[in-house]
Each structure stands twice: as structure tokens, then as C-alpha cells.
């Protein structure tokens, strides 16, 4: 039996793509172990899946001045020795790294143990952890065609991003039942990210009458963002957060408004959902969502509305255009070869564990 050690953490976005690979890797006969941080979000998620978890020390990597920048390198160094010991004991055939600060010591340790490493980068430009880890990687899987030039050493492989299988197995009727919709209006799903989006919530509710004249609305608005005054509004179903229900709600929707994080837009691509992307502005991000959205717009998969241009008339104009041209977007997405990241990545893993 082949053995793989996976690593990635710091945020859910560095863990869920790993989970998407797990069922296929198990089917292929791989024994799976996981190295993560001591107190990171990844520990709870991974242990819930019944995967053996090895915690190591790791310092956070920062691009800005902080007093912890003087102590954290020693935590990373400690993590390298801990990971090296784990890898030497477990003897994996390969290491798969999804990024996040905890992966740097693991990748270095694998390199020191002469174990091949495949990393994955979700965004167009690599994050700091993957930048530091790339010299020690055998290959780096990238999500966007534009990413290839940003990976040094001719190591980039265009694979797309892995999508959880259960997300593709939703039930449309269950989604409609959950929302209580009784008519046949097209359904608009609005996703503001795991924490919701204040600006998107406000513009949607401000234009609720106009939008409801044409669509039923599923609004995932984020924690503490429910509006009690809209609880019984016909055609409007609001949720703070969804988990198991998401596949059914996705399946039920005809159009989607979303932020432009790499994971969610590739989920929309896999599901062939016409979408309007409203990327985070540079005021509140490093600009990666703007680049992600531009790439999908260029490929004909998405329509984009800049946050700075998020006004009443622009929103309705874009929604109407998207719905009228929905089949064009569906056809474009159907031609993509980047909607099967799980297969593309597991094939690469197989190649380096023969």
C-alpha cells in the first residue's frame, strides 16, 4: 500500500481541497496521514475525518513588521525537525501540500528525507508559504493558466482545484423544499463568503423588490447578518451559514452571485452555474480575487462587477444580462478541462509514486 502525507492549514481554504482528494486517494489504495499545526483549524477538520494527525510547531509568515517575526523563524525551524522525524518514521511515498504557514517546515523536511513533494496553489499569484516552499517541491499544481509564469523552476502543472464530490451530488427538489419556494421563478443564490459580505447584503436587500420581481432568492448572508424583518418574505430564503445543505442549494440555483475566491469559483465551474462575481477590492485584500475574477471573465465563465461599481442600476443590469445569456456561459463552462481537479491531481500523485 502506498502512503501519502498531506499538509495544509491556517484557514479552511487550505484544508477543504485536501479533503476533496481523500475519497479518490483511498479508492486508489493510499494510506493517508496528515501533518498540521498544533492549534490550527485543520486539526479539528482532519481528525473528524478519522485521519491520523501529527501536530508540529510552526510560526506565522508575515509580509509586514511584527515583533513575532524575530521569534517565529525558530518555531519554523523546530517544526522542520519535528516533521523530519515524523516523515522518517512514517516513510511516506509522497507529500502533498496545500499551502498555509504550517506547510513550509513539512515541505523542507520532506525534501531533506528525499521524499517527492507536490504542492497546490489556488490563487493566480502564489502566497508567501508556497513561494518559500517551491524550491523544495517536485511539482506545483496551479489553478489558473496565468499562474504558470509565477512558479519558478519550470515546476508548474495546470490542474485546476479539487472539488468535494458531495458538492456535485445535490438534490434540486430538496433545495427548493428547504427554501419553501412555491412558484417556478428562476432561483438566484447569493454567497458572500464564510463570513458573509456587508456590502453585498446591503445592496441585495436595498434592491429586494426589483430582484424578487424576476427571481426567487437564496441568500447566505453570514453569521449575525440575518434580517428578522425579512423572515417571512415570499421568495426570499436567508441563511447565516450552510454546510450539509449547500449541495442542494447549489443544485437548485439557476444563477449565483459570489465573491471570487479560487475554491468557490471552481465549484461554480464544476457545477456549470452562470455567475456574477464581485471580487474583494484591494482595500481589503491583496487583490487575488480581482485577478481570479478577471481570468474567469476572460475565459467566458463569469460576469464581473467591481465592488467599487456596485450600484443599484449596475447590479440589475448585470443580473438581467447574465440570465438572458445563461446558456452561453453554461456552454463555455462545459468546454473547460479544468473542472476535474481531483482527477488531474491524483493522476500526478500516481505518476510520482510508481
UniProtKB/Swiss-Prot annotation:
Compartments in which it is found: Cell membrane
Q: Which Pfam families match?
A: Glyco_tran_28_C, Glyco_transf_28
Q: Which residues bind UDP-N-acetyl-alpha-D-glucosamine?
A: 11-13, 164, 194, 289
Q: Which GO terms describe its cellular component?
A: plasma membrane
Pathway(s) this gene product operates in, as recorded in its UniProt entry: Cell wall biogenesis; peptidoglycan biosynthesis
Question: How does this protein lie in the membrane?
Answer: Peripheral membrane protein
* GO molecular-function term, one example from the UniProt record: UDP-N-acetyl-D-glucosamine:N-acetylmuramoyl-L-alanyl-D-glutamyl-meso-2,6-diaminopimelyl-D-alanyl-D-alanine-diphosphoundecaprenol 4-beta-N-acetylglucosaminlytransferase activity
The cysteines joined by S-S bonds are none
Q: What Enzyme Commission number(s) apply to this enzyme? A: 2.4.1.227
Q: Which residues form a coiled coil?
A: none
Q: Which GO terms describe its biological process?
A: carbohydrate metabolic process; cell division; cell wall organization; lipid glycosylation; peptidoglycan biosynthetic process; regulation of cell shape
Q: What are the protein's UniProt keywords?
A: Cell cycle, Cell division, Cell membrane, Cell shape, Cell wall biogenesis/degradation, Glycosyltransferase, Membrane, Peptidoglycan synthesis, Transferase
State the signal peptide span.
none
Stored InterPro entries: GlcNAc_MurG, Glyco_trans_28_C, GlycoTrans_28_N
> Which catalysed reactions does the entry list for this protein?
di-trans,octa-cis-undecaprenyl diphospho-N-acetyl-alpha-D-muramoyl-L-alanyl-D-glutamyl-meso-2,6-diaminopimeloyl-D-alanyl-D-alanine + UDP-N-acetyl-alpha-D-glucosamine = di-trans,octa-cis-undecaprenyl diphospho-[N-acetyl-alpha-D-glucosaminyl-(1->4)]-N-acetyl-alpha-D-muramoyl-L-alanyl-D-glutamyl-meso-2,6-diaminopimeloyl-D-alanyl-D-alanine + UDP + H(+)
Give the similarity note: Belongs to the glycosyltransferase 28 family. MurG subfamily.
Q: Return the NCBIfam families for the record.
A: murG (TIGR01133), PRK12446.1 (NF009102)
Please describe what this protein does. Answer: Cell wall formation. Catalyzes the transfer of a GlcNAc subunit on undecaprenyl-pyrophosphoryl-MurNAc-pentapeptide (lipid intermediate I) to form undecaprenyl-pyrophosphoryl-MurNAc-(pentapeptide)GlcNAc (lipid intermediate II).
Q: What is this protein called?
A: UDP-N-acetylglucosamine--N-acetylmuramyl-(pentapeptide) pyrophosphoryl-undecaprenol N-acetylglucosamine transferase
Q: Which gene encodes it?
A: murG
Amino acid at each position: 500500500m502506498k502512503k501519502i502525507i498531506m499538509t495544509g492549514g491556517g484557514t479552511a481554504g487550505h484544508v477543504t481541497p485536501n479533503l476533496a482528494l481523500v475519497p479518490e486517494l483511498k479508492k486508489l489504495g493510499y494510506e493517508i496521514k496528515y501533518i498540521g499545526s498544533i492549534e490550527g483549524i485543520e486539526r479539528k477538520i482532519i481528525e473528524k475525518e478519522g485521519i491520523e494527525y501529527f501536530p508540529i510547531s510552526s510560526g506565522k509568515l508575515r509580509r509586514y513588521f511584527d515583533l513575532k517575526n524575530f521569534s517565529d523563524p525558530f518555531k519554523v525551524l523546530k517544526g522542520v525537525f519535528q516533521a523530519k522525524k515524523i516523515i522518517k518514521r512514517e516513510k511516506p511515498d509522497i507529500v502533498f501540500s496545500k499551502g498555509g504557514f504550517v506547510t513550509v517546515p513539512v515541505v523542507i523536511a520532506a525534501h531533506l528525507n528525499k521524499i517527492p513533494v507536490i504542492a497546490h496553489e489556488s490563487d493566480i499569484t502564489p502566497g508567501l508559504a508556497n513561494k518559500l516552499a517551491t524550491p523544495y517541491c517536485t511539482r506545483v499544481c496551479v489553478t489558473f493558466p496565468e499562474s504558470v509564469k509565477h512558479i519558478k523552476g519550470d515546476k508548474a502543472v495546470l490542474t485546476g482545484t479539487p472539488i468535494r464530490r458531495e458538492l456535485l451530488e445535490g438534490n434540486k427538489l430538496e433545495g427548493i423544499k428547504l427554501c419553501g419556494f412555491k412558484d417556478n421563478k428562476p432561483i438566484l443564490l447569493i454567497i458572500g463568503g464564510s463570513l458573509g459580505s456587508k456590502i453585498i447584503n446591503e445592496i441585495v436587500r436595498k434592491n429586494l423588490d426589483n430582484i424578487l420581481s424576476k427571481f426567487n432568492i437564496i441568500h447566505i448572508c453570514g453569521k449575525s447578518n440575518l434580517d428578522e424583518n425579512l423572515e417571512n418574505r415570499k421568495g426570499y430564503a436567508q441563511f447565516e451559514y450552510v454546510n450539509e445543505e449547500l449541495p442542494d442549494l447549489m443544485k437548485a440555483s439557476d444563477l449565483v452571485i459570489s465573491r471570487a475566491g479560487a475554491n468557490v469559483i471552481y465549484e461554480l465551474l464544476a457545477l456549470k452555474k452562470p455567475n456574477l462575481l464581485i471580487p474583494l477590492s484591494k482595500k481589503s485584500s491583496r487583490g487575488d480575487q480581482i485577478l481570479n475574477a478577471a481570468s474567469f471573465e476572460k475565459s467566458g465563465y463569469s460576469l464581473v462587477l467591481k465592488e467599487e461599481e456596485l450600484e443599484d442600476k449596475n447590479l440589475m443590469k448585470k443580473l438581467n444580462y447574465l440570465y438572458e445569456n445563461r446558456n452561453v456561459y453554461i456552454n463555455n463552462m462545459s468546454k473547460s478541462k479544468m473542472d476535474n481537479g481531483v482527477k488531474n491531481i491524483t493522476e500526478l500523485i500516481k505518476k510520482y509514486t510508481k
